[in-house]
Curated annotation (Swiss-Prot):
It is a single-pass type I membrane protein. One of its GO terms (biological process) is dorsal/ventral pattern formation. Residues 1-20 form the signal peptide. Eca and bai are essential, though not redundant, for dorsoventral patterning of the embryo. Specifically required during early embryogenesis for the activity of maternal tkv, while the zygotic tkv is not affected. Involved in Golgi organization. The lineage of its organism: Eukaryota, Metazoa, Ecdysozoa, Arthropoda, Hexapoda. Belongs to the EMP24/GP25L family. This is Transmembrane emp24 domain-containing protein eca. It comes from Drosophila erecta (Fruit fly). Residues 204-216 are cytoplasmic. It is found in: Endoplasmic reticulum membrane. Residues 30-126 form the GOLD domain. One of its GO terms (cellular component) is endoplasmic reticulum membrane. Keywords: Coiled coil, Developmental protein, Endoplasmic reticulum, Membrane, Signal, Transmembrane, Transmembrane helix.
């Protein structure tokens, strides 16, 4: 019982954690990130673009002419979202298939900003972390206890989705392993048949050679 409680606590701590980072890109550069998402899970992407200022040797808030083209593809390589956003914003989408979702970003800057160095701040929130509970409490007029219960219910739901996703991955891995083992078996059988045929042909050829030389 204690081990189960510890495992549940660890899962709650690591489940769908937020990912905050920043990276540098040029005008034509494209950056992609892979996020493993269960099905029917909300993902929120917060971003902010800054433009390098050579006079101050630092990054400043970008001008309105610079935005970001954001493209999201699911595990079936289908486009979930693809559009141009402003230099700072919040993007939200819901996964409909479990698996790796690829989030790609690149600048839509014009020739005026060609070659400019950009810094992009990125924060990806998955699952319960994508829910603004303060806003939920205000809209639904929840008490502190009701809000806490709501959070726990959402956590349990996310754990269930994560467990289903892990079972999906295990099933897919098992199917891949069985397919690989089957191919290895058939390849081994094919090699055995080829070797037997070659041995039979060599024996026939050797027998014909001995008969031609009247050695047998």
């Amino acid at each position: 019982m204690r081990d189960q409680f510890i495992s549940l606590a660890l899962m709650l701590c690591i489940l769908h954690s937020a990912c905050g980072l920043y990276f540098h890109i040029s005008e034509t550069e494209r950056k992609c990130f892979i996020e493993e998402v269960p099905d029917e899970t909300t993902v929120i992407v917060n971003y902010k673009v800054e433009l390098y200022d050579p006079r101050s040797n630092g990054f400043m808030p970008s001008s309105p002419g610079i935005g970001m083209h954001v493209e999201v593809r699911d595990s079936d390589d289908k486009i979930v979202l693809s559009r141009v956003y402003s230099s700072q914003g919040r993007i939200s989408f819901t996964s409909h298939t479990p698996g790796e979702h690829v989030i790609c970003m690149y600048s839509n800057s014009t020739a005026w900003f060609s070659g400019a160095q950009l810094r992009v701040h990125l924060d990806i929130q998955v699952g319960e972390h994508a829910i603004d509970y303060a806003n939920v409490a205000q809209k639904e007029k929840l008490t502190e206890l009701q809000l806490r219960i709501r959070q726990l219910l959402d956590q349990v739901e996310q754990i269930t989705k994560e467990q289903n996703y892990q079972r999906y991955r295990e099933e897919r891995f098992r199917h891949t392993s069985e397919s690989t083992n089957s191919r290895v078996l058939w390849w081994s059988l094919a090699q055995t048949v080829v070797l037997v045929c070659m041995g039979f042909w060599q024996m026939r050829h050797l027998k014909s050679f001995f008969e031609a030389k009247k050695l047998v």
